[in-house]
Amino acid sequence: MSNCELTVLKPAEVKLSPRDREGIINPMYDCQPAGAQYAGIGIKDCIPLVHGGQGCTMFVRLLFAQHFKENFDVASTSLHEESAVFGGAKRVEEGVLVLARRYPNLRVIPIITTCSTEVIGDDIEGSIRVCNRALEAEFPDRKIYLAPVHTPSFKGSHVTGYAECVKSVFKTITDAHGKGQPSGKLNVFPGWVNPGDVVLLKHYFKEMDVEANIYMDTEDFDSPMLPNKSIETHGRTTVEDIADSANALATLSLARYEGNTTGELLQKTFAVPNALVNTPYGIKNTDDMLRKIAEVTGKEIPESLVRERGIALDALADLAHMFFANKKVAIFGHPDLVLGLAQFCIEV
């Protein structure tokens, strides 16, 4: 037995220092690979392969699972000390082949770099060339697109990582397919948004009778509990949708920092006009988006959307001044989200 004495403090002797916390506690500000993974899971038949330690994948998947309450497939090369010293190219090649063998419907693999693999200088483009030769030899009847996504987390954030992954995947697939016949559709890049935002955007385009491809289509991340529901959740954006982006009537970039770079890429490479408008939060930003759609497509804004706008204005006129008059707000979030919410606060 130890001779140590145990001192028991009485409740009156315990002093607690109160801490006043204002604003947001632990805001979500993740690294570039997290944003790249979110872009990847928005594509159907796609599994992002994170070239780095297991933690770079595990904690991001946990974040997505906690937020959406769904399961997502994200793979890791599980880099260890040996690979950090001698290079991890072999891990990439092994990982790609394992995924191709295990998932017969797999069509897209974004290979996402991390801090460690960028610091040691792994040649991802070289690994992709090796992997393509191996895939062609083992799976001659399949085409799997490998996209290099350079996202070191010692710079940027999940916002820039998302934009980089979208741009790289689109470049890889559209370069392979090239320009085809005009589709008359709109490309829509809403940026990092939630499933409900995608559903609302689809509602707007349906009411205006405009065909549009929304990239990335994450509507199923809030999928209902149906009898045939899959245990894994994937986005609805297909390889064919991405390839068809080169044939679109125009691109509507609703996110200056999260989707505009891909719109600029399509404009430069395939002469698809790119229109940049703010994310449609609030009355003014939504008006700007609908006017731009009408301008590009030649369609008129329908009476149904005019009525919805009137209902929103009536609600603001009835209630907004009671709760928001002479109030100050602090907004923290994604750049495009902040721009949209700031405009909405000005309106109310």
From Swiss-Prot:
GO terms for molecular function: ATP binding; iron-sulfur cluster binding; metal ion binding; nitrogenase activity. The gene is vnfK. PANTHER family: LIGHT-INDEPENDENT PROTOCHLOROPHYLLIDE REDUCTASE SUBUNIT B (PTHR33712:SF7). It catalyses: N2 + 8 reduced [2Fe-2S]-[ferredoxin] + 16 ATP + 16 H2O = H2 + 8 oxidized [2Fe-2S]-[ferredoxin] + 2 NH4(+) + 16 ADP + 16 phosphate + 6 H(+). This vanadium-iron protein is part of the nitrogenase complex that catalyzes the key enzymatic reactions in nitrogen fixation. Gene3D superfamilies: Nitrogenase molybdenum iron protein domain (3.40.50.1980), Nitrogenase Molybdenum-iron Protein, subunit B, domain 4 (1.20.89.10). Keywords: ATP-binding, Iron, Iron-sulfur, Metal-binding, Nitrogen fixation, Nucleotide-binding, Oxidoreductase. One of its GO terms (biological process) is nitrogen fixation. [8Fe-7S] cluster binds at C31, C56, C115, S153. Its EC number is 1.18.6.1. This is Nitrogenase vanadium-iron protein beta chain. Binds 1 [8Fe-7S] cluster per heterodimer. Its cofactor is [8Fe-7S] cluster. InterPro entries: ChlB/BchB/BchZ, Nase/OxRdtase_comp1, Nase_comp1_CS. Hexamer of two alpha, two beta, and two delta chains. SUPFAM superfamilies: Helical backbone' metal receptor. Belongs to the NifD/NifK/NifE/NifN family.
